[in-house]
Design a protein with these regions (language model features):
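Short, well-ordered beta-strand core segments
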Residues: 115, 133-138, 191-193
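Post-Walker A helix-loop "phosphate-sensing" segment adjacent to the P-loop in P-loop NTPases
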Residues: 29-39, 52-55
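Hydrophobic anchor at the beta1->P-loop junction of P-loop NTPases
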Residues: 11-13
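ATP-binding Walker
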Residues: 16-19
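ATP-dependent small-molecule kinase phosphotransfer cores
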Residues: 41-117, 121-126, 144-148, 164, ...
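Walker A/P-loop
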Residues: 22
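NTP-dependent small-molecule kinase module
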Residues: 2-6, 79, 103, 151-156, ...
Length: 227
C-alpha cells in the first residue's frame, strides 16, 4: 500500500529503549512505502566510529564522517552490540554531537517528503518545525518485557549477557535519556501512545494505520487515497 496523493506525510515515532518503536517504524514504512530513518542507528554508528578509531578530537572527526554519509550504508551494519549500547547513552548527551546528527537528519528529511522518523526526540526536536510531523506516536513497554526482547536479540548475536544485566542497562539508558539537558526523551502533547506490551505486531500496525489514515483524511479530505 502506498499513497496516491504525492503530498508530504511525515510520521514521528518516539519511545524508550526496546519499546518496539523500531519494529513499528519499519512495518508502517513498508505498508505506506515511506522512507524509514532510525536516529538511534546514527548515534550507534557514531559510537562505533569512536570506539574503533579513538579520535583525539571527536567533534571534527564526526563532522567529517557524517558530511557525505550514505544512510543505507549504516543500515547494513551490526550496531547493536552491548559495547556500543553502553557507549551511546553518554555520547547522546553531548550537545555538539546531537547537532551534527541533527543536521544530517534534517538533510534526509528534506530529501524525502514521505518519511517515518524513529528515535527519542523526533517529535520534540527533529520534526517539531520546518517541517513539522503530520502525526506522532510515543511507544511504551513494560520494563521486563522490553528487557526480555532486547536480551533475545543479543542472544542471537552471541552476546554473553544476562537478562538482569540487560534490564539494568535499559533502565540506566532510559534515565539518561529522560534527564539529559539537550533533546531529552519526552512525549509531545499530541503524540498517540502505543503500548507494545499489550499489542502484537498486527494489532500495533492496525492501530497506527487507523490513526494515520484518520489524520490524512482530515488533511487531504476526499482526495486522500491509498493504493
Amino acid at each position: 500500500m502506498s499513497l496516491n496523493n504525492p503530498s508530504p506525510l511525515r510520521v514521528a515515532c518516539d519511545g524508550e529503549s526496546s519499546s518496539g518503536k523500531s519494529t513499528a517504524a519499519k512495518l508502517i514504512s513498508k505498508k505506506y512505502k515511506l522512507f524509514c530513518m532510525n536516529s538511534g542507528l546514527l548515534f550507534r554508528y557514531a559510537s562505533r566510529l569512536i570506539i574503533k578509531h579513538k579520535p583525539k578530537k571527536i567533534i571534527p572527526f564526526l563532522r567529517k564522517k557524517f558530511k557525505n554519509l550514505n544512510y543505507k550504508y549504516i543500515t547494513r551494519l551490526n550496531l547493536h552490540s552491548q559495547e556500543i549500547s553502553n557507549h551511546v547513552a553518554f555520547l547522546a548527551k553531548q550537545k555538539r554531537v546531537r547537532q551534527i546528527i541533527r543536521i544530517f537528519q534534517k538533510k534526509i528529511i528534506r530529501q524525502h517528503h514521505q518519511i517515518c522518523c524513529e528515535g527519542r526526540d523526533q517529535a520534540s526536536a527533529i520534526l517539531n518545525k520546518n517541517p513539522r510531523y503530520d502525526i506522532a506516536f510515543f511507544f511504551k513497554c513494560n520494563p521486563s518485557t522490553a528487557a526480555y526482547r532486547r536480551w533475545k536479540d543479543l542472544k542471537t548475536s552471541n552476546e554473553q549477557i544476562t537478562l538482569d544485566e540487560v534490564k539494568e542497562s535499559l533502565k540506566k539508558r532510559n534515565e539518561l535519556d529522560v534527564k539529559r539537558r539537550f533533546s531529552p526523551l519526552i512525549q509531545s502533547k499530541d503524540s498517540i501512545i502505543i503500548r507494545t506490551d499489550k499489542l502484537n505486531k498486527k494489532a500495533m500496525v492496525t492501530k497506527m494505520s487507523k490513526e494515520i489514515e484518520k489524520k490524512l483524511l482530515l488533511k487531504y479530505g476526499r482526495n486522500f487515497r491509498t493504493k
